[in-house]
């Protein structure tokens, strides 16, 4: 297949639309089910690069959950403990494969943003992973292959119209890429930068210790940022992104957004949330929305008389600000990556509130000294990578 016609481009009025490589070359994909759209393929091809690089950098199966050309979550296949399995809604599935754990983590980090995601998997999709995907609201998946039973499970989604794409894992794009805006062609070399432990060698803080587990988290955050719309900041812990602040025009707003998402991820692990008793038959999306409201400032939207009875079997107590603060103080050893330098120490102050202890950023600000001093204030370890990771 040398080209694939699409229903339309970004919007229904943008016709005609198609994908192709040029020079009469074959596309490196097969569409096994469904009719993926323009934005689906943008998500798929960005996501595939992300998980391919995560697998190369860590040696572990990887997954990402994409929405509107930025990842909502990304992770490698570390095992889930009982609490993680519960908050990711996979505790009823028994033992999970490493790839299934990776997708459960990627989808579970920010379930509100991942609703209707496009999934990318680094490895052949197995049955355990397909079972998780089947019951989530998702637009499609791209992987280097599918086990026969897994493919049959996925084909049952959306009445047989679920988008399933298989990509040639050996495909290598041309070293020069092009983009057209307003009839004008932009050309640049592909971002072939290898993100690995060597980038974390230049530690500029008094605390010089970055353990191996934190290095993996920093690598995950940086690779995630490489395929996130800029400006962007990523919080990571235990082999996964836990908060991604994408597409903001100021660095501090990236950090605040990513930090608030990381806080929500940790609040969902609190006894207050784990003890919620939902009514029988409530949908997964309704459950996610209710939790999001319950842990936020608008908690009365789910606790008002006449409303909570439709959601919970037993009316929950209010999760007070004091209780949330006390719980969040237990969040530690979080890693943070930034796609460009921090211009002010306020980013570090905000990061500290969400348990950040390890940071990787390019460096190069005229106020680097202030940023380093703020890290030293909290005994953080920060590496200057010397590389920027803008993505547009």
Outline where the language-model segments fall.
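Conserved helix-loop functional segments at active or binding sites
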Residues: 53, 227, 264-268, 353, ...
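Active-site loops and adjacent core secondary-structure elements that bind or stabilize anionic groups
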Residues: 1-199, 214-232
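Alpha-helix N-cap/helix-initiation motif
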Residues: 36, 40, 214, 247, ...
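Flexible, glycine/charged-enriched surface loops at secondary-structure junctions
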Residues: 57-65, 164-167, 230-237, 267-278, ...
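Glycine- and Gly-Pro-enriched alpha-helical subdomains that act as flexible
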Residues: 72-112, 242-341
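Active-site-proximal loop/turn and secondary-structure-junction residues that shape catalytic pockets
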Residues: 70, 125, 237-240, 342, ...
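Gly-rich Lys/Arg/Thr-decorated short loops/hinges at beta-loop-alpha junctions or inter-strand turns
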Residues: 23-35, 109-115, 189-208, 285-307, ...
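C-terminal binding/interaction regions
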Residues: 117, 121-122, 135-165, 170-172, ...
């Amino acid at each position: 297949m040398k080209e694939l016609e699409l229903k339309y481009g970004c919007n229904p009025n943008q016709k005609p639309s198609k994908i192709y490589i040029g020079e009469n070359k074959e596309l490196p994909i097969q569409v096994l089910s469904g009719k993926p759209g323009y934005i689906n393929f943008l998500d798929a091809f960005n996501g595939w690069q992300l998980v391919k690089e995560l697998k190369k950098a860590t040696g572990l199966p990887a997954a990402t959950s994409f929405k509107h050309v930025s990842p909502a979550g990304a992770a490698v296949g570390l095992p889930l403990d009982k609490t993680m399995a519960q908050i990711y809604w996979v505790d009823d599935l028994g033992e999970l494969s490493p790839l299934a754990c990776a997708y459960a983590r990627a989808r579970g980090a920010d379930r509100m943003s991942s609703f209707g995601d496009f999934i990318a998997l680094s490895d052949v999709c197995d049955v355990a992973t397909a079972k998780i995907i089947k019951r989530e609201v998702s637009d499609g998946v791209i992987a280097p292959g599918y086990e026969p039973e897994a493919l049959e499970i996925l084909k049952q989604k959306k009445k047989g119209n679920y988008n399933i794409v298989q990509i040639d894992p050996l495909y290598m794009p041309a070293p020069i890429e092009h983009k057209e805006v307003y009839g004008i062609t932009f050309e640049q070399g592909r971002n072939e930068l290898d993100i690995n432990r060597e980038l974390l060698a230049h530690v500029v803080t008094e605390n010089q210790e970055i353990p191996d587990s934190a290095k993996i988290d920093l690598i995950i955050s940086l690779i995630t940022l490489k395929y996130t719309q800029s400006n962007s900041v990523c919080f990571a812990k235990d082999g996964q992104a836990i908060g991604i602040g994408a597409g903001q025009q100021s660095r501090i707003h990236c950090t605040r957004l990513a930090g608030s998402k990381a806080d929500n991820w940790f609040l969902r692990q609190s006894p207050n949330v784990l003890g919620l008793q939902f009514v029988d038959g409530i949908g997964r999306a309704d459950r996610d929305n209710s939790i999001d409201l319950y842990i936020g400032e608008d908690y009365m939207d789910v606790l008002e008389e006449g409303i909570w009875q439709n959601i919970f079997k037993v009316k929950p107590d209010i999760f007070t600000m004091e209780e949330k603060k006390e719980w969040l103080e237990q969040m530690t050893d979080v890693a943070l990556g930034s796609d460009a330098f921090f211009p002010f120490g306020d980013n570090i102050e905000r990061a500290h509130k969400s348990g950040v202890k390890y940071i990787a950023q390019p460096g190069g600000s005229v106020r680097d000294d202030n940023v380093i001093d703020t890290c030293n204030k909290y005994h953080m370890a920060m590496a200057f990578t010397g590389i920027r990771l803008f993505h547009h």
